[in-house]
């Protein structure tokens, strides 16, 4: 059974104390979570040559705040919403009304403000529960929301996140975690040697503003095909393909084969990331219809991050469980709508292991 301890992490610019909660299991896996933004600060995985911290991040509270309040916020390790990913022209309609959101990513709305909230915490057994509210009108969204994020670390080295939301008005919800994974143990170098597997026959192409076009395309015969695992470096620089050229890497949603008839099968692997250096693997499971794969295309800015390291471009991979981007404006896609009396429920699990590559390790 996992143990949970805590320690002070820092103070926000508004004077609020921030606490770091550390979950550890008997096998040596350790996960650190902050009550600011529900940030995953560290995931330390035992490996043959010693423990490896497999997520990017910052050393201080001030660094996280400077990042998250900048125009180029990375949301590094954070819980994001109300609507993870982009909403076209920062507008959508629900309940017969049209809502204008903050346009914080060019003309579009991206992610929202949940990464900048302070959460109330309860710890019991091997579980950490973080709760907060989102008032009606926050970022322009309707409805008063009650948020609950539950973190669980199991003895088989699975780290699971469960999200639950209720609303008192018709609204939309799409939540995810924005951790940046580098399984190599050296985030001072590119991570494109990591292997990726995606259980997905289709993806949603995006335009030059990273907005989904409304199409669903087959991955067959394109650099988007990860049904047979391969190193990212084999395809990430293929600028003859417009999707990679526009994004300077991968920043796309894949339509998971594990989601059928309106339900996700979280007993089946939807994605695997693996390092040929440390032999650390990550197997992902979710009930969501999509996964956003982002390869750190906007990293390499020269900003010093965790341990003073300046991360290069393509140093990491985000695997973000989600509804498809801009689903509120794409009526044929899986629904992001939430009504009063209903419960939004989403979860994702990352299972860590070591050894040679395998899909069902």
Regions found by a protein language model. Give the residues of each.
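An exposed, glycine/acidic-rich loop-and-rim segment of catalytic or binding clefts
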Residues: 2-361
């Amino acid at each position: 059974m996992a143990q949970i301890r805590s320690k002070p992490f820092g103070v926000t610019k508004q004077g609020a104390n921030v606490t770091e909660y550390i979950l550890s299991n008997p096998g040596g896996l350790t996960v650190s979570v902050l009550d600011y933004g529900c940030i995953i600060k560290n995931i330390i995985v035992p490996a043959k040559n010693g423990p490896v911290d497999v997520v990017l991040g910052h050393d201080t509270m001030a660094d996280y705040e400077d990042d998250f309040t900048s125009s180029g916020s990375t949301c590094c390790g954070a819980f994001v919403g109300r609507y993870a990913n982009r909403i076209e022209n920062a507008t959508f309609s629900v309940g017969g009304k049209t809502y204008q959101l903050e346009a914080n990513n060019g003309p579009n709305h991206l992610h929202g403000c949940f990464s900048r909230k302070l959460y109330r915490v309860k710890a019991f057994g091997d579980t950490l529960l973080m709760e907060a509210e989102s008032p009606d009108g926050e970022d322009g969204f309707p409805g008063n929301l009650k948020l609950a994020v539950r973190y669980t670390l199991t003895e088989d080295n699975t780290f699971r996140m469960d999200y639950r939301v209720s609303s008192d008005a018709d609204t939309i919800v799409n939540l995810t975690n924005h951790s940046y994974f580098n399984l190599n143990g050296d985030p001072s170098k590119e991570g494109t040697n990591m292997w990726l597997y995606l259980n997905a026959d289709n993806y949603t192409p995006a335009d030059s503003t990273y907005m989904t076009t409304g199409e669903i395309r087959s991955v067959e015969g394109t650099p988007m095909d990860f049904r047979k695992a391969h190193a990212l470096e084999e395809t990430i620089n293929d600028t003859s393909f417009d999707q990679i050229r526009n994004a300077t890497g991968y920043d796309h949603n894949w339509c998971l084969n594990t989601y059928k008839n309106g339900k996700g099968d979280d007993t089946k692997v939807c994605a695997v990331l693996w390092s040929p250096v440390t032999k650390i693997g990550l197997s992902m499971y979710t009930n969501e219809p999509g996964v956003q794969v982002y390869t750190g295309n906007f990293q390499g800015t020269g900003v010093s991050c965790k341990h003073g390291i300046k991360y290069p471009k393509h140093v990491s991979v985000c695997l973000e469980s989600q509804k498809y981007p801009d689903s509120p404006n794409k009526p044929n896609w899986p629904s992001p709508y939430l009504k009063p009396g209903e419960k939004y429920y989403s979860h994702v699990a990352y299972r860590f292991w070591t050894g040679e590559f395998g899909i069902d390790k």
